[in-house]
């Protein structure tokens, strides 16, 4: 079986081990590796997003030098999705090295960070990429090629609207955004990232996972006690297998044959 190389980029202030469920799966639900996907994780760093993108580009070059099979698949979770799309933005000539780009729960045009500084200070997280996620940050304007503004709607609330048509990705790039939608938030966000932000205002092809447990953490099977307590998320294993299935279908991956041995009596 041909082995596909996938590089996985973790989210904000998160270790790569948070991908373990998607990678390895469980005895009941085999993970990505059972589909012949060689999963390599990018490390946890505390630099800015711009610096991290350059570091990521060097990482990809090292994989090529080591003889890994190319083109490769990029998968980024949350802030990690900004890194993989940022790589395509900064290094367009290298787009041919990437077969598929997958972003999970990624705020492609940013998030509102007015409450996050207090959480950031309380947790004392060292990640310098915090400010880059803001809707109005210079990084977001660079990534999308445009900024945005708030517009009051007839529905009685404000919508974030881009000032002009954004940069989406390299021509012909195979991209997919996977996002959760929970009923307690009106089925339009995962508790942290809005559907419009995850899809760049419906411009990036998307797959939505909807349900009471399809929150920002469960979508990759990562359970953070603090986030669970502060956001009221419920934790279980119902959602990440749906994410796994979405990824493998997008890649056209087939599971390897499983050999089950007859138990000894």
Regions found by a protein language model. Give the residues of each.
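A generic "structured core" feature
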Residues: 72-74, 87
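The conserved beta1-alpha1 loop
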Residues: 7-10, 77-78, 105, 190
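Gly/Ala-rich beta-loop-alpha elbow adjacent to hydrolase catalytic centers
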Residues: 76-80, 84
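Active-site catalytic motif of lipid deacylating hydrolases and related acyltransferases
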Residues: 1-72
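Short, solvent-exposed loop/turn and secondary-structure capping segments
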Residues: 18-20, 86, 113-115
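A structural signal for isolated positions on well-ordered beta-strands in alpha/beta enzyme cores
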Residues: 7, 38, 73, 100-102, ...
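A conserved amphipathic alpha-helix that caps or lines the catalytic cleft of carbohydrate-
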Residues: 60, 87-88
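Helical cap/lid subdomain of alpha/beta-hydrolase-fold lipid enzymes
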Residues: 89-265
């Amino acid at each position: 079986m041909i082995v596909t190389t996938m590089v996985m980029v973790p989210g904000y202030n998160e270790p790569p081990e948070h991908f373990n469920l998607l990678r390895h799966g469980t005895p009941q639900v085999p993970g990505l590796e059972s589909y012949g996907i060689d999963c390599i994780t990018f490390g946890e760093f505390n630099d800015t997003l711009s610096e991290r993108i350059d570091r990521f580009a060097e990482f990809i070059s090292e994989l090529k030098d080591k003889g890994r099979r190319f083109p490769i698949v990029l998968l980024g979770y949350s802030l990690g999705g900004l890194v993989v799309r940022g790589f395509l933005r900064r290094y367009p000539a290298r787009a041919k090295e990437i077969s598929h780009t997958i972003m999970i729960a990624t705020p492609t045009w940013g998030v509102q960070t007015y409450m996050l500084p207090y959480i950031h200070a309380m947790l004392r997280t060292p990640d310098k990429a915090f400010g880059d996620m803001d809707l109005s940050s210079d990084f977001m304007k660079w990534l999308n090629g445009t900024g945005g503004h708030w517009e009051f709607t007839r529905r009685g609330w404000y919508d974030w609207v881009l000032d002009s048509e954004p940069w989406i990705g390299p021509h012909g790039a195979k991209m997919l955004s996977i996002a959760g939608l929970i009923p307690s938030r009106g089925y339009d966000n995962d508790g942290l990232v809005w559907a419009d932000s995850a899809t760049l205002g419906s411009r990036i092809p998307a797959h939505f996972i909807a349900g009471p447990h399809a929150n920002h953490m469960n979508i990759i099977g990562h359970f953070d006690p603090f986030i669970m307590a502060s956001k009221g998320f419920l934790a279980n294993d119902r959602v990440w297998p749906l994410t796994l299935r979405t990824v493998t279908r997008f890649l056209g991956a087939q599971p390897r044959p499983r050999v089950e041995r007859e138990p000894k009596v």
